């Protein structure tokens, strides 16, 4: 039983749908209608509010993160990843409604919506804190760009047609040089995503570790390296590779030159996930592995 019930401390709940998943906004409508019946305030952006019949308070996206105590994210794991950074900065818990394939983050299935919302109202849920990663990119002009990831930070060769030699430093000490298509730095949450597809290890969600994994390395001995959350990573390249891509949680953020340096460490903020389901991590993992074998 959680000490903070909706309607008690959490009085302002934002609804963020993925329009590519909830195309007709019927799921959004169901959730907003439930809020109306429960005398709770639901907030959406104007472009959503004008397309549903149920009453919601229309605010800008920026105001949504300023006002709301918690967020309902409708779509799937990818949709949760898209809001994780902004929510973590404001320390806002997220609960996901899964309209995609089997996911690790979205906890509510469409057929469970009303029952799950009632559990939230009664405080029958837990809040999991998920470790995040921070990437600081230093440009040749000494400009700094900072990003935060819940899943992973990837540096890949982009449109460059050849392998790239990636120099990896751990805690400012040279670790190795990897000839590869790219490097994945993954949190425990992201270890079951791109990292797993690239042959990296699975980390349990609560582990105080993260992992760096080469993508298609051109050497037999190149393996993943598991680091403690106190370690730092520096990624640079040793040749004139053009248009290398930096992706954060699967989204392209910027292109890099060999003169850019990428520093990665554990972030100070965390993503808070509201968990209602009885499904455990390894239950979901087994289902996902079976799905991939089909």
Label each region the model flagged:
Residues 90-108:
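Short, acidic/small-residue loops that bind anionic groups at enzyme active sites
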Residues 155, 160, 171-174, 221-294:
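ATP/nucleoside-binding phosphotransfer catalytic cores, i.e., glycine-rich phosphate-binding loops
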Residues 168, 190, 246:
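Short aromatic-centered micro-motifs
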């Amino acid at each position: 039983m959680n000490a903070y019930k909706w309607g008690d401390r959490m009085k302002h709940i934002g609804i963020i749908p993925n329009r590519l998943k909830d195309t007709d906004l019927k799921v959004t409508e169901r959730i907003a209608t439930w809020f109306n019946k429960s005398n709770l305030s639901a907030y959406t952006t104007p472009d959503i509010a004008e397309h549903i019949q149920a009453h919601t308070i229309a605010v800008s996206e920026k105001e949504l993160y300023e006002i709301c105590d918690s967020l309902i994210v409708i779509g799937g794991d990818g949709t949760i990843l898209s809001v994780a950074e902004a929510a973590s900065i404001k320390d806002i818990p997220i609960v996901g409604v899964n309209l995609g394939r089997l996911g690790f983050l979205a906890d509510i299935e469409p057929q469970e919506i009303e029952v799950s919302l009632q559990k939230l109202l009664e405080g029958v849920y837990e809040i999991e804190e998920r470790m995040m990663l921070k990437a600081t990119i230093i440009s040749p002009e000494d400009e700094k760009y900072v990003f935060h990831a819940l899943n992973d930070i990837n540096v890949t060769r982009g449109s460059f047609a050849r392998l790239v030699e990636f120099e990896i430093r751990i805690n400012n000490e040279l670790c190795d040089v990897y000839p590869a298509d790219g490097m994945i730095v993954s949190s425990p949450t992201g270890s079951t995503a791109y990292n797993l597809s690239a042959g990296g290890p699975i980390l349990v969600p609560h582990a105080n570790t993260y992992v760096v994994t080469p993508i298609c390395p051109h050497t037999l001995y190149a393996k993943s390296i598991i680091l403690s959350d106190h370690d730092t990573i520096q990624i640079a390249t040793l040749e004139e590779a053009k248009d290398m891509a930096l992706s954060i949680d699967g989204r392209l953020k910027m292109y890099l030159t060999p003169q850019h340096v990428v520093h990665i460490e554990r972030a100070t903020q965390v993503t808070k996930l509201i968990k209602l389901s009885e499904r455990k991590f390894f239950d979901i993992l087994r289902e996902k592995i079976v799905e991939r074998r089909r």
